[in-house]
């Protein structure tokens, strides 16, 4: 859950 949110946040910002 934490790893997914970390990869999802930066990917959506990019």
From Swiss-Prot:
Keyword Secreted: yes
GO CC terms: extracellular region
Subcellular location field: Secreted, Cell wall
UniProtKB keywords: Cell wall, Secreted
Main location: secreted
Statement: the UniProt record of this protein carries the keyword Secreted: yes
Protein name: 30 kDa cell wall protein
Species of the source: Daucus carota (Wild carrot)
